[in-house]
Swiss-Prot record:
Its main location: membrane. GO terms for molecular function: NADH dehydrogenase (ubiquinone) activity; NADH:ubiquinone reductase (non-electrogenic) activity; quinone binding. One of its GO terms (cellular component) is plasma membrane. PANTHER family: NADH DEHYDROGENASE. NDH-1 is composed of 14 different subunits. Subunits NuoA, H, J, K, L, M, N constitute the membrane sector of the complex. This is NADH-quinone oxidoreductase subunit N. It comes from Geobacter metallireducens (strain ATCC 53774 / DSM 7210 / GS-15). The chain crosses the membrane at residues 9-29, 33-53, 68-88, 100-120, 122-142, 157-177, 190-210, 232-252, 263-283, 289-309, 314-334, 359-379, 394-416, 438-458. It catalyses: a quinone + NADH + 5 H(+)(in) = a quinol + NAD(+) + 4 H(+)(out). The gene is nuoN.
Amino acid sequence: MTITELWALIPLLILACGSVFVLMLGAIVPGRCGTVIGVAVCAGTALWAMLAPPQPLAPPTLGVTVTPFTRFFLVFFAVTAGLSLLLARDHAARQGLKGEEYPATILFGTFGMGVVASAANFLTLFLGLEALTFAFYILVAYDHNRPASGEAGLKYLLMGAVSAAFVAFGIALLYGATGTLEISRAVAASAAGGGIALAGWGLLLAGLAFKISLAPAHLWTPDIYQGGPTPVVAFLASGSKGAAIALFLLILSPLGTLGTLRAPLWGLAFLSMTVGNLAALLQPNVKRMLAYSSVAQMGYVALALLSGGRGYEAAAFYAVAYGAMVLAAFGALASLEGETPLEQVDDLRGLGYHRPFQGVVLAVAMLALAGIPPTVGFVGKFAIFFAALKGGEAPLAVIGILTAAASAYYYLRVVVNLYMKPADETGSGQRPTVAEALSLGIAALAIFILGIWPGPLFDLAAAILR
């Protein structure tokens, strides 16, 4: 490996070495310094990916290539991980959770996300995907004080194993049909691969549908969101979904035309938008509501992927937008939680007055998820529906617009409970710590800044997909 190649791989090495360092330091010097080091590692990764001179790897080294696409998502993953670490620090202390395994595992999961975004062949892609999934197996089950957390971790493990089997079998069929593990060559040779290649792409799509929670492969999502520690769910909903979107873009954008994959992706988008929103309408549990909401939101991303061209740009934009929105939503919930988690939407009654900062952030997140201007949620949804109309997906775009309008009911129900219903006298929520306030403030500002001034991010999304 040359110095140039090593230089390009430094962001991934920072994350991998940082994870090991935090874990070993926690064993030698127990304390809470892991979060500080973890945030510093994430900041270093993001700064290096943004500011270091471009050193593309061609041909790929170790199955990894570093391109503007890779750098874009590395910055996104590092920022979401850093904000999640800030949220987790004091939340873990309130829940009685100790040890540096928490920040170390978050860093390891971020490393897996970076490997996924920089993968040049299917083997590296699979290893990165399983690295980030393995990290979430641990994180979801980390709260040993709550049986629901262990149950959620077990369910995620089982569903993750099924997903991994689909992905691995799909990769095996593609290798058999095309004779190569390199993604670009496999895409080019797929036309000559016949039915075997088609089956491989179909299995790969099915496995990724599990990862991104597209209906009907979404049934694990509500239990994981409800049972897992809230800061972990924030990271899962932002970073992990962003990695899955990056993976879809990595595979689908070189295809040019989706061909026979269009029909199953159309069905996944339709089911996700309708089933996700209908299920969320009926949910009294706030985390399960947001879980079903995430199914619908990923349905909009699938609609963007169907549209091609501008749709891919809209999907990349929405990965960042959705990350900011769910970090703000789950971050506010995590900040409000004491020794027991907030469960029902009714538990939020009057908290907008008792805890104004968290109330405002949560309300902003709900308005953004509902697609109300001038938030980034409105801009992202507008871009997706516009791309769908331009891309010949008018019927599905109309369905998306109608379901997005219906979703305003359950998002605004949270805002109504925050500000228009009397407070529950049994508790008034936790005050935000400095770390939590910083994380929530950054997420809320991103929602407004990207909603008012989305041009630079759209330009960047277009540039990385050229």
